[in-house]
Every structure is written in structure tokens, then in C-alpha cells.
């Protein structure tokens, strides 16, 4: 099975690392590529820095692609060339167009840092803390058109302690 991984920040690394380990132990699984956001300027000096997913993927010998858009002919051609059976999406940072969601034979699976349907979209862990929630979690689901919609496959809860911060929740998920 050919899997295309799409992710950008540290949160996506846990899943990518697990997928790399699994693919190395199972010849029937191949990571055909990693799609991540383009390098962005950061800090006071606006130094161009790569996303954490790009750094790890390159260190792991995986092909990395950083398209500006998922809606042009160039990306459609890349998708056709990679021909993934499944796309795994973890905190990629852009909404996937229907053409991408519908492309792989087994669909797209998303890992989201909240107990959906609560906190769809960006910064779900931070929003749970701001709202004073006592628990949050992670949801794995098949993707559908729309923001964090689709059939849920798995949900796991995580208690938010009185002194927990973003880092505690991030690492706990």
C-alpha cells in the first residue's frame, strides 16, 4: 500500500515517525512522499526555516514536496505520479480540495487534536485550554469535504490537569 503523508508542525511528527517505523517493518507499506507547507520566515531576523515534518522526512530519506497550492495542475500531476492508495493528514494547515480527498483508493485519514466535532479547525488544543476544558483528546477520521468532517474511526480522551499547558497536552496526545 502506498501512503502519502501530509503534515507540517511538530504535532504531525508523532504520526509520521510511527508510520516510518511501521513501513520499515512491513514491506507491503510504502511512504510514497511527504507533502508539507513551504518553508516560512521565522523570528526577528525572518530566517527561512523548514517545517519540522520536512526536516524529519529528509533525515528519513523520504521524498518531500512543498506545493504552494493543492488546486493547480502541477499538484494534480504530482498526485497522479505518486499514485497513493491512502493519504494520511496530520495538521497539514490547509483544507484539502475534494479532488485530493477523492483521489486515493482508500481515501484520506485525518488525525485531529480534539474530540471532534468540538474544536474543528486550527489550534484545537489551545482553544480547549482557553475555554477551561477538563478534557480533550484526539480523533482519527476519514476525511470528507468540509472542515474536519467525516466518519470517525477512533477517539481517545486526555484529561487536562489544573496546571497543564499546551506542551503537556501536545505531548500527551
Stretches with model-predicted labels:
Residues 1-44:
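N-terminal Rossmann-like dinucleotide-binding module
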Residues 2-4, 31-35, 60-82, 87-89, ...:
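Internal alpha/beta domain cores that form substrate/cofactor-binding pockets in large enzymes
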Residues 21, 58, 80-81, 102, ...:
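Solvent-exposed polar/charged
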Residues 39, 72, 144:
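Positions that flank functional sites
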Amino acid at each position: 500500500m502506498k501512503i502519502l503523508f501530509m503534515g507540517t508542525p511538530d504535532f504531525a511528527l508523532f504520526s509520521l515517525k510511527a508510520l516510518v517505523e511501521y513501513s520499515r517493518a512491513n514491506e507491503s507499506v510504502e511512504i510514497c512522499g511527504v507533502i508539507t507547507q513551504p518553508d516560512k520566515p521565522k523570528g526577528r531576523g525572518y530566517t527561512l526555516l523548514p517545517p519540522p515534518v520536512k526536516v524529519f522526512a529528509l533525515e528519513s530519506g523520504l521524498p518531500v514536496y512543498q506545493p504552494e497550492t493543492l488546486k493547480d495542475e502541477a499538484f494534480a500531476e504530482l498526485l497522479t505520479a505518486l499514485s497513493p492508495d491512502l493519504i494520511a493528514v496530520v495538521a497539514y494547515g490547509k483544507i484539502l480540495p475534494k479532488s485530493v480527498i477523492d483521489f486515493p483508493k482508500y481515501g484520506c485519514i485525518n488525525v485531529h487534536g480534539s474530540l471532534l466535532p468540538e474544536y474543528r479547525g486550527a489550534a484545537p488544543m489551545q482553544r480547549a485550554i482557553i475555554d477551561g476544558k477538563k478534557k480533550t483528546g484526539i480523533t482519527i477520521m476519514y476525511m470528507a469535504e468540509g472542515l474536519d468532517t467525516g466518519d470517525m474511526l477512533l477517539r481517545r480522551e486526555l484529561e487536562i490537569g489544573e496546571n497543564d499547558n499546551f506542551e503537556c497536552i501536545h505531548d500527551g496526545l
